[in-house]
Amino acid sequence: MKLSIVLSTHAAQFQAVAFKGDFETNVAKIAGYGYEGVELAIRDPKLVNPEELEAVIRQHRLVVPALGTGQAWGEERLSFTNSDPAIRRAAIERIKSHIPLAARFKAVVILGLIRGITPAGQTHEQSMAYLIEALQECSAAAAPYGVRYALEPLNRYETDLIHTVTDGLDLIERVGADNFGLLLDTFHMNIEEPSIEESIRACGSRIFHFHVADSNRWYPGAGHLDFKRILTTLFETGYSGFVSGEFMPKPDADTGARRGIEYLRQF
C-alpha cells in the first residue's frame, strides 16, 4: 500500500489539511514519518515554482500522486456552477491551468468544492448542466497530456451537488470522458453511503484516487471506521494508486500524521 498525505503549499483556511505553510520543513517531516507521497493542495499554479517544488520533493524521494484544487473555492469562491458566467469561466481556466503541473508529476487533479453550490434563484438542473459543461471542457483539455481528473463526492452539509458514488457514476456517464473519474473519501462516504464497501465495489475502475480520514475526520484509527475491511475492498477492485490522508491536524499535525501511518501500516 502506497501512502501519501495532503500538504498545502501555502496557508489555507481549509481545516482538513494536516500540513500547511513551511513547505520544505513539512516535506521533510512527511518523508521522515514514512509516507511515500505528498498530495499538494495548490490554490493557483501561478503561485508556485514547479522546479523548486520538484527539487524539494525529489530530495526526499517522494512522489506527487494528486493535486488538490479546493482552495480556489475556499479562498476565492471560484466554482463551475456560479450564476455569474465570468466566475464560471475563471474556475474552468484555473482548473485547466493545473494541467502542466499535473503532467509534470503524473498526478491526478482533484475536483472537490470547485464544483460549487447551487446559488439562490438557480435550479439544481441548471447547476448540473453548468457542471457537466465545465467537466467536459476540462477533460478534453487534459486528455492530450495524459492528465486525469477525479471528482470527489462530498457530504450533503458541504454542497448539494454529487454526494454519493451513484451520483458520481451517473455524472461520469454524462460527461463521457475516459480521463474523468472519482476520488472516494472515507469521511464523506461514512456520512452518505449505506455501505462504504459496496460503494467502493460499485465504483471499481473509476476510482482514480482515495482519501482516508476516520469518522470524526481525525487520523485513521481515531474513530470507528473499519479500515481493514475498507482497504481490503479497495484493493480487491484492482486499485493500485495511493491512499492519501486528508484529515484534521488533531491533536496536532505531527501526531496525527505519525499515528495515521502507524495505524494504516497494520494492513
Question: Which ranges hold each PLM region?
Answer:
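Gly/Pro-rich active-site loop or hairpin
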Residues: 10-20, 79-86, 122, 158-162, ...
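Active-site acidic/histidine proton-transfer and metal-coordination neighborhood
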Residues: 22, 78-181
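Hydrophobic faces of well-ordered beta-strands that scaffold small-molecule active sites
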Residues: 3-7, 38-40, 64-69, 109-111, ...
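N-terminal pre-domain/capping segments
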Residues: 1-97, 103, 177, 205, ...
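Generic structural signal for well-ordered alpha-helices
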Residues: 24-28, 50-54, 95-99, 132-139, ...
